[in-house]
């Protein structure tokens, strides 16, 4: 049995290394000119949420939290897990409570989805053509990840679907980095 904290720490560093390698790859294949397309910081906030979600995904995996509350969109009969209290979210021990970790993982996914829709709307509204391809790729991967996450829950965290969900997080990181890179540099 591995501590979910150690598992998430290990996974986080693996994703940081992957991110640095992929960012350097993008530097090698594209000519850069510093010019942000989206003037706000939504892409950076999106990236932070993705990394946070991966950490909570590791918590879910390490605690087998995906094997409880195998319903969606509710957790059992309510939005919040009925074996807990909302006040418990504000205690450090929440990170070791399987139902709260699953609750947080679900809700970070909802935030990511809402933020993606906001960013995509901004890209298309402002006709930022250079970001059309990256935002479409990112959208496909976001929807894939959400779909696989829901299937993982409904399957009781079956090994095949859970593995696909974990693998697609790699695609999500790379698609997010690609969008962030294309937003930051024009070529």
PLM regions and their residue ranges:
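Polytopic transmembrane helical bundles with strong interfacial aromatic enrichment
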Residues: 1-187
